[in-house]
A protein has these predicted regions:
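Glycine-rich loop(s) and the adjacent beta-strand/alpha-helix scaffold that form part
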Residues: 212-219, 231, 259-338, 517, ...
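Conserved N-terminal/central alpha/beta ligand/cofactor-binding core
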Residues: 46-235, 357-359, 366, 400-403, ...
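Helical element adjacent to the flavin cofactor pocket in flavoenzyme catalytic cores
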Residues: 201-270, 309
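Extreme N-terminal leader/targeting segments of oxidoreductases
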Residues: 1-18, 36, 219, 223, ...
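Helix-rich C-terminal "cap"/substrate-channel and partner-interaction subdomain
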Residues: 387-494, 562-565, 569, 579-580
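A glycine-rich dinucleotide-binding beta-alpha-beta segment and adjacent secondary-structure elements
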Residues: 244, 251-252, 445-540, 544
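N-terminal Rossmann-like FAD-binding beta1-loop-alpha1 element of flavoenzymes
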Residues: 18-43
């Protein structure tokens, strides 16, 4: 009997100089710099949009000693080095943070000179650890300039949306500074004019687009980077999965990619940059590396599942040393949206530090200065939980606070809270005792805590946790409130509470690299032409969080270093890039 034989499908082939895995800020920076350096560059994105976790973020980058600082007469290099030495100590190789401090300003200047990726400096944005020498009051963080999404044309929908809870009217973005101004809309002509301008633009946008096209924060940064990639005809493969990295004789030289149902063998003549965003969205890796109780939710992009880390380990790449928690944290409240999806709302600066709120554990007791950074706040939750149940933590305030500042997904000046109570997101009662019972915390402990705290609020001095005593606390408080911008009484019923739990915004455990972002193997030797940046790279800060935008600053700086190093490397014989 004759058998008909069907030939196996042939694997397609492609060749590029530089291949970047991941379309967040770090990956797009690497791809853009590669293209600007004359490399044939490919960006591979596993989803159908660019932006990664960057699109959900503030878009701030922490770059000490940047040009905008120096133009104001501030030479910040020595102080920043002192600050990071005090913060990180011996947990990570000092040469890596020195490489960051040296290259960060160069990266910004490079992009400013060659692209329209642009930032403006925060003059008043204090570093998170004001207790350490070298901490700055501002100047190191920079925010991306707003971007007109209409300039992307049909590619506008390729930029990932921010989380819905950080937009107004279902699609209008505003900056933190604009949010502060808009809170005065009933008392200020400036606020009224700003609101009218923003809403008018948004309504016009909605005639043609599914959301507003005035992009700010991380969306602006992602869109600016993406537009510059498009302008330079950088190849971007969406919905593409990398199955395997290929290495020969200690050199990363290619990868197998599945795209549109076909397997493609891609040769990379100069380098491969891993920028997959770490593993905050991987249940398996969270179980393996995170502290208990395990974080169930994440505020990161769902595609950050550690694929690139596992692929690199298959060719000998080394992970960094385990840290205290191997994560970078937000305390987040969890809600169910109308469409049934889950909202993970990060409590960053809009409520925790404002006057009139305390954070308590199951004993009804405070355990932390509520105004510390989101990372330190969540770490304090875990530390307290070792002795008394602190996960979830309850943020407790009164109705007056919710009206003035909002609470989690509840915006300021929300007139009716019944829907939030009915959904279970908000707990509310006429007395602290009643609220404590609904929350499941000790009523006597909560009553004593609020009584003590109210005394602190009247005196303006938090004897217990010193809230409002440093510049970072005060910057996150209410400058118009006296005597302490972070302390106010909790005294007018009804009383309210929202639960927060640890959620990873990123991971600090990643691939070990050298100062050029080149990944090293388990013997400490560089794997030639294999690079990592962002959360795929082991934290240069040893899991610490120095200031606003520190992670994006690292990601973009080492993405820049990776591309520059790859561009200067020798070309393997036989590649197209080797031909005259």
């Amino acid at each position: 009997m004759a058998h008909s034989l069907t030939a196996a499908p042939q694997t397609e082939t492609a060749e590029f100089d530089l291949v970047v895995l991941g379309g967040g800020a770090g990956g797009m920076t690497a791809a853009l710099v590669g293209a600007l350096e004359g490399l044939r560059t490919l960006l591979i994105e596993k989803s159908d949009q660019v932006g990664g976790t960057t699109a959900y973020s503030s878009g701030t980058v922490w770059i000490p000693n940047n040009t905008q600082q120096r133009q104001m007469g501030v030479e910040d290099g020595a102080a920043a080095s002192e600050y990071l030495d005090a913060l990180v100590g011996g947990r990570m190789d000092r040469r890596l943070r020195q490489a960051f401090l040296a290259a960060g300003p160069l990266m910004l200047d490079y992009l400013t000179a060659r692209t329209d990726v642009a930032f403006r400096m925060y003059r008043q944005q204090p570093d998170y650890r004001q207790d350490l020498p070298g901490a700055a009051l501002g100047g190191r963080p920079l925010e991306p300039l707003p971007f007109d999404g209409r300039l992307l044309g049909k590619d506008f929908d390729r930029v990932r949306w921010p989380i819905p809870e950080l937009m107004l009217f279902g699609g209008m973005m505003i900056t933190r500074g604009e949010a502060t101004r808009l809170l005065k809309i009933g008392r200020s002509w400036d606020a009224l004019l700003l609101g009218a301008t923003l809403v008018s633009r948004f309504l016009l946008d909605r005639l043609r687009y599914r959301r507003g096209t005035r992009l700010v924060l991380g969306n602006a940064l992602a869109a600016r980077l993406f537009r510059n990639l498009c302008d330079r005809n950088v190849a971007v493969w969406f919905d593409s999965t990398t199955r395997r990295l290929i290495a020969q004789d200690g050199r990363a030289c290619g990868l197998l990619v599945v795209r549109n149902g076909s397997e493609i063998s891609v040769r990379a003549t100069r380098g491969i940059v891993l920028a997959g965003g770490g593993f905050p969205a991987s249940p398996e890796l969270r179980e393996r590396f995170f502290p208990k109780p395990l974080a169930t939710y994440t505020s990161a992009f769902a595609g950050c599942t550690g694929d690139t880390l596992l692929l690199a380990q298959e060719i000998g790449a080394a992970l960094g040393p385990l840290g205290e928690d191997n994560s970078l944290w937000f305390p987040s409240s969890i809600a169910t949206r109308r469409d049934g999806s889950t909202a993970v709302y990060p409590h960053i600066v809009l409520d925790r530090a404002k006057p009139g709120l305390v954070a308590v554990n199951v004993a009804g007791r405070r355990f932390v200065n509520e105004a510390v950074s989101y990372h330190e706040f969540t770490r304090a939750m875990y530390r307290s939980h070792r002795t008394v149940s602190t996960i979830p933590t309850w943020l407790v305030c009164d109705r007056r606070f919710v009206w003035k500042y909002g609470l989690g997904i509840i915006r300021p000046m929300t007139p009716v809270l019944g829907g939030y109570v009915k959904s279970g997101y908000l707990k509310q009662a006429r007395s602290l005792t009643g609220l404590a019972r609904i929350m499941g915390v000790d009523p006597a402990g909560l009553a004593e805590t609020v009584r003590t705290y109210n005394g602190f609020a009247r005196s303006g001095v938090d004897v217990q946790f010193h809230r409002g005593e440093n510049a970072y606390d005060r910057a996150c408080g209410d400058a118009a409130h006296r005597p302490n911008p972070c302390l106010g009484p909790i005294e007018r019923p009804p009383f309210c509470a929202v639960a927060v739990v640890p959620t990873p915004l990123g991971t600090s455990l990643g691939l070990l690299t050298d100062e050029s972002a080149q990944v090293v193997d388990r013997a400490g030797q560089p794997i030639t032409a294999l690079y990592a940046c962002g959360n795929d790279m082991h934290s240069v800060f040893g899991g610490e969080y120095p200031g606003a935008g520190a992670e994006l600053g690292l990601a973009m700086t080492f993405g820049y270093l990776a591309a520059k190093h790859a561009a200067s490397a020798a070309v393997p014989p036989g590649s197209k890039g080797d031909q005259p």
